[in-house]
Amino acid sequence: EEKNAKLNSLSYFDRQTEINWTERGPNEQGGRTRAIMLDANFANNGRVWAAGVSGGLWYNDNIDSQTNPWTKISDFWDNLEITTVASDPNDANTIYVGSGEKVGSAGIGLGMWKTTDGGSTWSQLTSTTGYRFMGDMIVRDESGTSAVYIGTGRALHEGQYDGINGLWKSTDGGATWTEMLGEISENS
């Protein structure tokens, strides 16, 4: 009942109510931001993550401050076309990022990366190197097991189609994947 009340309160939008947005960066350096995520430890560390398809991966530890700087993870991420970021609901220190933007074949990705220490170190998930274009990702708690779902696409790149199309699921931290829905039409 409480959940339904919360959902219902979100479903009504008064068009007369003005919403004011305040820019928080990363300024002139983050590229086009494609993904944003509140850190799973946000209540304790205030961290917000931002991922850009041409600017890398960033975090800010005080998003409420207009002067608090964004920290770039490393120059390595600049050209990876980061398109999605998600945290593990069962382990606040585990975060996944996906790469590759299918829209207009803007940038081929190199799969997914994972951190298990809150973002200090990252490892490429070699099981995902064929996933060239990632549309979205979510990590869900399924009866105590963290299930990672990713939507991947195939797109025309250098004259031929590249990538693996479908909806995929991993229950072992990205070591292996099960196809949930594959071979989606190129025009879907």
Report the location of each language-model feature.
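Extracellular glycan-interacting surfaces
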Residues: 1-188
